[in-house]
């Protein structure tokens, strides 16, 4: 239940808080941050992927419902991003297997199918995508999902 609360219901609560002001202005942009795990579930976190799948679906519904009122809703779906969570996973692998950090990161990359760009993404790169999606330059973009994963997801 914690995965659902953190990865879906927190966004729903925030949206409920900000939507009245956006509706009053008849404009606004919401960007939800999902995860590539909704497309490729990870057995090590079985509730996380489904919660992110629900968030992605919820974003589509919100875009359709509030688009006529001038509110845009999009989803950003990161793959392997260098975060404290990714680092913690690498450290757990190091401890479990008694291997170096480089070996643990290589194991993580193999588990997710590799990253063609050869490195994890950065939080700054994800933030730049979000900034674009809330900007006027993206005024006609709504109901879309943007995968930012260095080419990892090869599914159409």
Name what the model sees in each region.
Residues 15, 51, 59:
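Active-site helix of classical SDR
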Residues 40-46, 68, 118, 136:
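Active-site loop immediately N-terminal to the catalytic Tyr-X3-Lys motif
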């Amino acid at each position: 239940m914690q995965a659902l609360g953190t990865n879906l219901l927190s966004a729903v609560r925030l949206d409920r808080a900000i939507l009245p002001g956006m509706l009053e202005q008849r404009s606004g942009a919401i960007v939800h941050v999902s995860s590539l795990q909704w497309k490729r579930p990870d057995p090590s976190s079985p509730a996380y992927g489904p919660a992110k799948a629900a968030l992605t679906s919820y974003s589509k519904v919100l875009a359709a419902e509030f688009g006529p009122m001038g509110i845009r809703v999009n989803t950003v779906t990161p793959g392997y991003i260098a975060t404290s969570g990714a680092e913690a996973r690498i450290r757990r692998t190091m401890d479990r297997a008694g291997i170096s950090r480089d070996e643990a990161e290589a194991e993580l990359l193999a588990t997710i199918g590799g990253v063609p760009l050869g490195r994890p993404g950065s939080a700054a790169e994800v933030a730049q995508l979000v900034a674009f999606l809330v900007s006027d330059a993206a005024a006609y973009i709504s109901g879309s999902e943007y995968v930012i994963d260095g080419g990892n997801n090869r599914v159409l």
